Amino acid sequence: MTYDLPPLREPDLPRTAKVRPVALRTGWTTGACATAATKAALTALVTGVSPEQVEIGLPAGRRVCFPVARCDRTADGVEAVVVKDAGDDPDVTHGAELTATVGWRWVPGLALEGGPGVGTVTKPGLGLTVGGPAINDTPRRMIGEAVAEVVDLAVVGVRVVISVPRGEIMARKTTNRRLGIIGGISILGTTGVVRPFSTASWRASVVQAVQVAAAQGEQTVVLCTGGRTERAARELLPELPEVCFVEVGDFTGAAVTAAVTHGLSGVAFVGMAGKLAKLAAGVLMTHYTRSKVDLSLLGAVTVEAGGSADLAAAVTAANTGRHAYELWEAAGLLGPAGDLLCRRVRTVLRRFAGDAVTVDVAMVDFAGARRVAASGRWSQ
């Protein structure tokens, strides 16, 4: 199996992109809203008083207040609703009623379940238990921390069921079914905050961030796809000041172009498997509406790294880029295959930059906790 050098593409923005004369308004993730609903319901269960608003902590340490739309007694405990405000992001879950039904259980600790409107995971590759609810790790942790602010989970047991009225209908407008999540939406979010990234304004903010680094005399810009990869990048390059780290989201091409335009000498990219696979295929604007993970490329990388034909076939048929990563890891091929993938991304970025900058690439695990592969300065 071979894979030639791909053509370089930087697709246009989605049709939802708008240039606005004022700053875009951020919103809250489904995970943050589910956390707030949980705390409201549990507070009412403990105190007998339904709160009009609740305060929760976000992963970065900031604390925010959410209005509670409804908080009622039920046969199973207390049910509370927080309505999602997605800000200016074109999010199909804007206005969704994140509902938490909270009751006691006999065993100490927290039991978190998905109710109607929350999807069920049916395929591997998402980092979630197959057969379980589509509630991602960060929202699970946020909910646990919010519960622990109200009761001592070492002493009492709490059961939380998250549901979303009309969630199954909302999910039809998402990629959930293709990913193997059926019956509803996912409870998502790594920061608790929704940033309206699929807009021309977000791309402009990426370019501006590179400009600021250049204006301060820095020679290297470090491109990260999100909060976890930025934390990993800071661990990898602790000598660089904060201004060098740019959260590019889907706009890697725009950031590289800005780095060349403003005379920087180096670009480092730190990402996870899915985004790296898109870049390796020559796609420099990686919004999900404009690109998909090229699994045939990952299959070719598998063979090149010494993997068997059966493993290459499994990778090519994987459900997601993460699923391919997990197959490599299980086969003991994550290091060699990941290094090759990073090398391909490095080649793409250098070509896109016309060899005007040096390029280093690192792949980190899905927790952003460790570097698992690299090309350039981090190569073994």
Swiss-Prot record:
Lineage, broadest ranks: Bacteria, Bacillati, Actinomycetota, Actinomycetes, Micromonosporales
MF terms in GO: cobalt-precorrin-5B C1-methyltransferase activity
EC number: 2.1.1.195
InterPro entries found in the cross-reference section: CbiD (IPR002748), CbiD_sf (IPR036074)
Protein name in the entry: Cobalt-precorrin-5B C(1)-methyltransferase
Family under the similarity heading: Belongs to the CbiD family.
Gene Ontology biological-process annotations: anaerobic cobalamin biosynthetic process; methylation
This protein's UniProt keywords: Cobalamin biosynthesis, Methyltransferase, S-adenosyl-L-methionine, Transferase
Keyword Methyltransferase: yes
Natural source organism: Salinispora tropica (strain ATCC BAA-916 / DSM 44818 / JCM 13857 / NBRC 105044 / CNB-440)
